[in-house]
């Protein structure tokens, strides 16, 4: 029976088998991991790459056949190399080898996830795959089957919603995955991986959807549909409700657009699933949902402005994370607060020098309308803290300074020292590679305003990410452990695909946040 996933992104079906099929499946591709041969293995009769994890699924004859093909292709076994071979002794159409580099006694889950992603991107028109990747020995605690499924699904992801027949792919993409595995929990792990990958793909879909089709009202509608399908309680505040309740940041940022802002609340009451509901933790999630960011009156340069379709990636990840928590029935309470607005220049847009009253009463002088994300996040943080959470995790494409400091693949993590470090460590474990950043107390002095409680930017050129983090810290309630994940670069890949990461939306940091929820559910 296939492993099924809940409603949402419709990816391939996932199956687990204890052996290769006996009958001919010539339409399928067998993905086999290989490693570089050790010095003692290399000879005229041995290739530079050798098959890993052969037993019990591949016979000695099949291994010899594959390695002969690798030798003919002069494969070296270097990381991320792929080769397509024909192995007549096997009941498959072809064999795709993916190299993991030097041999190891234990493999990190993300190394295997990445190899699976590389293989998936090399499948061509193949719709059915079988793989022995799950038989690689993982590090202690690593969920290898889950990593394999995640890598294959995320690597094969593609977004074609707006392509006509003229440019749409002629094939259906990857439709079926069979993981060869003998582990007792292989089916459970594979199901977990499929559900996680589907959530990440949902986040990617939202980010890749152009702002012509995903504006605040439509984004809120999508969030409501996804939330209700997962069994979440959903509350949507429109512009009139936001104005009445005093969400000055969201209203101020959104007032320049004809498309009015929204704020969505998604609630997972998982504590009732806990063994001891009274001791179950409560987590608040907040994600920035700027559906398009021109910069407003402080307008951005035109050259790369089209990438600002991704300025709602934090919101997409938060929505995907909480629906995933509901689908996998995490025994903790999770509440997501998601502000949504479009930042446009117009005769009604906020001006540099305007003063906003944020939700909760703090006044902010808007010195730069392109520092708008922190304004809507501030409203959402105050509202989220009214629920008295134990932890607050928020994420956004907060600052271009994140890419200056850490590049396009490493999120910056700021917040309460211990919790920040916990989030960063978890991010590194799942392969999203967050890095802890400091928030020096003196940064608050740079946010002084001559007319309001705070200014939304400092007069300094430097430490822009940290200054934004210091601004957000002013809105976090005392006693709440919190972390902000700045994904300005990692949320959207403008370079070539790599690993299981496509060009365009990446889904970062969905897996980090969900892994944190799992960790909190298990360890408090």
UniProtKB/Swiss-Prot annotation:
Protein name: Probable cytosol aminopeptidase
GO CC term, one of those recorded: cytoplasm
Annotated keywords: Aminopeptidase, Cytoplasm, Hydrolase, Manganese, Metal-binding, Protease
Catalytic activity: Release of an N-terminal amino acid, Xaa-|-Yaa-, in which Xaa is preferably Leu, but may be other amino acids including Pro although not Arg or Lys, and Yaa may be Pro. Amino acid amides and methyl esters are also readily hydrolyzed, but rates on arylamides are exceedingly low; Release of an N-terminal amino acid, preferentially leucine, but not glutamic or aspartic acids
Native source organism of the sequence: Mycobacterium leprae (strain TN)
Function: Presumably involved in the processing and regular turnover of intracellular proteins. Catalyzes the removal of unsubstituted N-terminal amino acids from various peptides.
Pfam family, one: Peptidase_M17_N
GO BP: any one term: proteolysis
EC class of the enzyme, as a word: hydrolase
Active site: 300, 374
The protein's Enzyme Commission number: 3.4.11.1, 3.4.11.10
Cofactor note: Binds 2 manganese ions per subunit.
Family, similarity comment: Belongs to the peptidase M17 family.
InterPro entries: Leucine_aapep/pepB, Macro_dom-like, Peptidase_M17_C, Peptidase_M17_leu_NH2_pept, Peptidase_M17_N
Signal peptide range: none
Residues bound to Mn(2+) 1: 293, 370, 372
Main location class: cytoplasm
Binding site for Mn(2+) 2: 288, 293, 311, 372
NCBIfam families: PRK00913.1-2
Compartment(s): Cytoplasm
Cofactor field: Mn(2+)
Taxonomic lineage: Bacteria, Bacillati, Actinomycetota, Actinomycetes, Mycobacteriales
One term of GO molecular function: metalloaminopeptidase activity
């Amino acid at each position: 029976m296939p492993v099924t996933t809940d409603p949402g992104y419709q990816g391939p079906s996932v199956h687990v088998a204890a052996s290769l099929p006996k009958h001919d499946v010539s339409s399928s591709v067998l993905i086999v991991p290989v490693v570089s041969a050790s010095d003692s293995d290399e000879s005229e009769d041995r290739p530079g790459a050798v098959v890993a994890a052969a037993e019990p699924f591949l016979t000695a004859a099949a291994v010899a056949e594959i390695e002969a093909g690798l030798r003919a292709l002069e494969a070296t076994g270097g990381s991320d190399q792929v080769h397509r071979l024909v192995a007549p002794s096997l009941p498959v159409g072809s064999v795709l080898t993916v190299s993991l580099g030097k041999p190891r006694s234990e493999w990190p889950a993300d190394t295997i996830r990445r190899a699976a992603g590389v293989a998936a991107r090399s499948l061509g028109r193949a719709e059915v795959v079988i793989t022995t990747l799950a038989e690689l020995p993982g590090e202690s605690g690593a969920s290898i089957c889950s990593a394999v499924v995640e890598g294959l699904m995320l690597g094969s992801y593609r977004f074609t919603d707006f392509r006509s027949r003229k440019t749409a792919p002629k094939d259906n993409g990857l439709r079926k995955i069979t993981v060869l595995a003998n582990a007792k929990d292989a089916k459970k792990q594979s199901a977990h991986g499929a559900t996680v990958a589907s959530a990440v793909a949902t986040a990617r879909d939202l980010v890749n959807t152009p702002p012509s089709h995903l504006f605040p009202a439509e984004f809120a509608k999508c969030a409501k549909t996804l939330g209700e399908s997962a069994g979440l309680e959903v509350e949507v505040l429109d512009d009139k409700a936001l104005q009445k309740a005093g969400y000055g940041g969201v209203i101020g940022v959104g007032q320049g657009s004809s498309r009015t802002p929204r704020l969505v609340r998604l609630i997972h009451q998982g504590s009732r699933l806990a063994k001891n509901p009274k001791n179950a933790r409560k987590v608040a999630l907040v994600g920035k949902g700027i559906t398009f960011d021109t910069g407003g009156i402080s307008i951005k340069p035109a050259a790369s402005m089209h990438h600002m379709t991704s300025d709602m990636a934090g919101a997409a990840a938060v929505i995907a994370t909480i629906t995933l928590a509901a689908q996998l029935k995490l025994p903790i309470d999770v509440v997501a607060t998601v502000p949504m607005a479009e930042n446009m220049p117009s005769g009604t847009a906020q001006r540099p020098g305007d003063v906003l009253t944020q939700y909760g009463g703090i006044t902010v002088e808007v010195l730069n309308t392109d520092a708008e994300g922190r304004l809507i996040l501030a409203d959402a943080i105050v509202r989220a803290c009214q629920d008295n959470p134990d932890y607050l995790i928020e994420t956004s494409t907060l600052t271009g300074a994140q890419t200056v400091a850490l590049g396009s693949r490493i999120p910056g993590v700021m917040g309460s020292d211990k919790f920040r470090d916990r989030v960063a460590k978890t991010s590194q474990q799942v392969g999203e590679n967050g890095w802890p950043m400091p928030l020096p107390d003196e940064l608050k002095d740079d946010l002084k305003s001559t007319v309001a409680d705070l200014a939304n930017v400092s007069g300094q050129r430097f430490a822009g990410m940290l200054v934004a983090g210091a601004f957000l810290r002013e809105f976090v309630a005392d006693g709440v452990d919190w972390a902000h994940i700045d994904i300005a670069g990692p949320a959207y890949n403008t370079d070539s695909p790599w690993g299981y990461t496509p060009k365009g939306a990446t889904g970062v940091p969905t897996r980090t946040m969900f892994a944190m929820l799992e960790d909190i559910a298990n360890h408090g």
